[in-house]
Amino acid sequence: MARAMDNAILETILQRVRPLIGQGKVADYIPALASVEGSKLGIAICTVDGQHYQAGDAHERFSIQSISKVLSLVVAMRHYPEEEIWQRVGKDPSGSPFNSLVQLEMEQGIPRNPFINAGALVVCDMLQGRLSAPRQRMLEVVRALCGVSDITYDATVARSEFEHSARNAAIAWLMKSFGNFHHDVPTVLQNYFHYCALKMSCMELARTFVFLANQGEAFHLDEPVVTPMQARQINALMATSGMYQNAGEFAWRVGLPAKSGVGGGIVAIVPHEMAIAVWSPELDPAGNSLAGIAALEQLTQTLGRSVY
């Protein structure tokens, strides 16, 4: 039986999953992420009609990292015909780590999907070709989607990622060798790392992504963000490829389209109802939030929600 939502449900869920804190590992590949306190835990919901619910550290901002890959795809969809995007990046899950080069080499420089690093870099390469100021444009889009004017990039995180960018640079140069990367590699990498370094809270993320629960429309915006078809396509990609190589396990446990980031955030969508954002910085071996997945599993079981 599906239950109605209230803050007490979210508080109870956080109490249930809090014992998991200490069992995961905060991302440490760059110092700026490694310094985050691992005990943080938050959850927020925004419904399609504008109701908000939250518990824990739901208002504390953190580095959204790969969650931004959904946002860059949204911007690309608004500036490119569908066929131009999907001839350069695929729609299939990779089954490989998010920063793998092996599969990319075997498949002639065409990334499996836009939510692995290679695919997101292709999307950023496309934005560089269509936008005069890609970083500023992304800020404008995110601020509009969220309705919050002071969202910005964490310059320390972006700089730290650029200083440790050898593997992502290798991915970009490999794609360039296959003719699937057209612009200056360092410039596109800087844009990509700034997108990953967006700082947002669970509440801001839930509000930002609620359009995906409502066929591309958000209750607080006059114009659709994307078309209903594009919203379905993005949700489908999130369901198959949004949780790195553990998308199948996540579908089994949670049953919602979702996108994670190594900052410990996860955004999940209940179509026609709500967007959910959780944050717990400690990660499982696949790079997904350990307590965050458990919280989403508890929530879908409690509310009786699943797309399957």
Swiss-Prot record:
Residues that bind substrate, according to the entry?
S66, N117, E161, N168, Y192, Y244, V262
Gene3D superfamilies the UniProt entry points to: DD-peptidase/beta-lactamase superfamily
Its keywords, alphabetically, are: Hydrolase
Give EC number(s), comma-separated.
Answer: 3.5.1.2
So what does this thing catalyse? L-glutamine + H2O = L-glutamate + NH4(+)
**MF terms (GO), sorted A to Z:** glutaminase activity
Single GO biological process annotation from the record: glutamate biosynthetic process
The UniProt similarity line reads:
Belongs to the glutaminase family.
Q: What is the annotated quaternary arrangement, including any partners?
A: Homotetramer.
Q: Fetch the NCBIfam families from UniProt.
A: Gln_ase, PRK00971.1-1, PRK00971.1-2
Q: Report the protein name in the record.
A: Glutaminase
- Which organism does this record belong to? Salmonella typhimurium (strain LT2 / SGSC1412 / ATCC 700720)
